[in-house]
A protein has these predicted regions:
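Structured mid-to-C-terminal alpha-helical surface segments
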Residues: 1-52, 64, 68, 80-338
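Glycine-rich beta-strand-to-loop/alpha-helix junction loops that act as flexible
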Residues: 54-58
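Glycine-rich active-site/cofactor-binding loop and its immediate structural neighborhood
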Residues: 76-77
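Betabetaalpha-Me/HNH-type nuclease active-site subdomain
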Residues: 61
Length: 338
């Protein structure tokens, strides 16, 4: 099968240009999407493939075609059952995180490299993220039980220009703490393959993907938890508002607010596996949930939304004011659910 990278430079540039015209998204993003796709393909050939799950915002665009947003990161999980740890005590959760982190950084990282080479991919290097940089620029080792683990695939862009908001690297976040269900197998392909069928078939893969009903609820819960912090984040966070708005009128969004069992299972799972001191998990329940940014946060969130609209969305967008109106409407729907 053919891989985009195997074409001549002139052919690859022509394909990027045509895909840019079709999807109305910058060539830098088209190129990065190809790397996201081929990295996904290689990851789902690793030894944990049977327990590997594709989730998050990128799964909404690449797996389900539900959002018109370029998604640059790969969010994955491996079932805790894969590591043979079933109990949920604090000590067992710490043991699980340590065992999983060693496996991700030692085994998955090496297998990813091997699988990319088998596909014929060149011009990249893999970095296991083992240090954190604080606000003062000081580096410190990442904790041995840190979850998720982060692996970066740095690639050599064939384009002469770059965009600060879209660096030439694929960020892989892989966790051992996520739920296993509900999921469904989905076909993943690059923008190049969708523009020129058959010309990038080797990068295409079928991957186990989280069903959007769950992703929809998890995004609302993530925001509700974030806004319980004294100083909530805003950089690259407005995408969750965009995704919620895009999903709220779909069958998945409507079903999510009718499935009390799924709703409560996700809340319970988060309270056990993601427990953090600043979150009151009872506030995730419909009667109390709040995922609308506070007034003092609006300027920062509006700025982040503008950045996202400029670089990542390839369809018409709502104004920030209209987006907030829709999110408030959605919050009302949550409050009236069940």
């Amino acid at each position: 099968m053919t891989l985009w990278l195997n074409h001549t430079i002139d052919e690859r540039i022509a394909m990027l240009q045509r895909a840019e015209e079709k999807f109305r998204i910058n060539q830098v993003a088209i190129e990065k999407d190809w790397w996201v796709t081929v990295v996904l393909n290689a990851l789902f050939k690793c030894s944990c493939a049977d327990q590997l799950i594709f989730k998050g915002g990128t799964s909404l665009s690449k797996g389900w075609n539900l959002i018109e947003r370029f998604s640059e990161d790969i969010d994955l999980s491996v079932s805790h059952e894969f590591f043979g740890i079933e109990k949920t005590t604090k000590n067992q959760r710490e043991k699980l995180r340590k065992k999983a982190r060693r496996y991700f950084l030692d085994t998955v990282s090496a297998e990813l490299d091997e699988n990319l080479k088998k596909l014929g991919v060149e011009g990249y290097h893999i970095e296991n993220v083992v240090e954190e940089i604080d606000e003062d620029g000081k580096a410190s080792p990442v904790a041995s039980d840190k979850d998720p683990s982060v692996i970066l695939v740095h690639y050599e862009s064939m384009l002469g220009h770059t965009i600060e908001y879209i660096p030439p690297r694929v960020k892989i976040e892989i966790s051992c703490l996520s739920m296993n269900e509900p999921t469904e197998d989905r076909l993943i392909s690059s923008y190049i393959e969708q523009t020129f069928p058959g010309e990038d078939a080797a990068a295409t893969a079928t991957v186990r993907t989280v069903v959007p009903t769950r992703t929809f609820l998890e995004k609302a819960f993530l925001l509700c938890e974030e806004f319980q912090k004294q100083t909530p984040r805003h950089v690259r966070m407005s995408r969750h508002l965009y995704d919620l708005e895009r999903l709220m009128d779909t069958g998945f969004g409507k079903q999510a607010l009718q499935d009390i069992d799924l709703y409560e299972r996700i809340v319970k799972h988060r309270s056990i596996y993601y427990a953090v001191g600043y979150v009151d998990y009872s506030k995730l329940m419909p009667s109390e949930i709040d995922f609308v940014p506070r007034q003092e946060l609006m300027k920062d969130w509006e700025g982040d939304y503008a950045e996202m609209c400029n670089h990542f969305i390839y369809d018409q967008t709502l104004s920030f004011e209209k987006l907030l109106e829709r999110i408030k409407e959605l919050q009302d729907r949550f409050r009236k659910a069940f």
